[in-house]
């Protein structure tokens, strides 16, 4: 018997300001403040012949405050567009755990991202190049704090062979910080055999992402070919270890995770008096999950097909698709 109850309150305030300045300049300011109150309850009991064998109660009552502020500056030149910005995120969390196991955690986390980029065009080539630096900081009450700096370049190139054919490639390096819930140094009983344990020693990791896209159109026919690759060394993923005849589910910086994905979309339309459009997509995802104590691979083939009809002010659509599965960790 395992009833669960969860409630969340999430009020937020979003302030946005944009101003056009002389000499083709633009200034954008954005600030978001959010408060999240969460109450989660889980009760797990095991009975045999009307005899209570185990009774596990877990309650989490938490408050999280966050402020996200960002400033963006852009200026248009004859050769292209120059932009830059600063984004800062600050979070405070206070969680109280009660039931079979009790405790309290107070955590602070911040991330600052400073970046600049330039976009331009040379004949048939559109390009964007940017660089950025991010700083991640975390402090849990009773533990040492940490901070990490990450260099984050990105590039985007698109070559237009004709008005109906182009090739585009994007590449970027992103910083991923652990969530406050993953960093919590608290154990929670799931049932009589499983325990979920936080890890205050998690470190941010980098994600190297690349995407390529080729599109060709001729008349009513369109072909769209996509390829995606992501590589995350030291990615934070779950693993299961055994201690004192219990299975401990923890997250840790594992060896790495990779995803390779490719798909082809064929579209025809509009046909039959310019009313009907058809689209078919087929693709595959391959996942490689390398843990400190495990190694797994998984392939997911998927498809998607749709028919759309448009007549005057009316539109109807039918779509069917298979599961688009993901695989991370164990």
Please annotate each region the language model reported.
Residues 2-143, 160, 221-227, 258-286, ...:
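Face-selective signature of the C-terminal outer-membrane beta-barrel domain
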Residues 132-134, 172-176, 186-188, 230, ...:
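Active/binding-pocket-proximal capping segment
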Residues 175-224, 231, 249-261, 269-271:
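Outer-membrane beta-barrel signature, preferentially recognizing the C-terminal barrel domain
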Residues 229-231, 253-325:
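Gram-negative outer-membrane beta-barrel transporters
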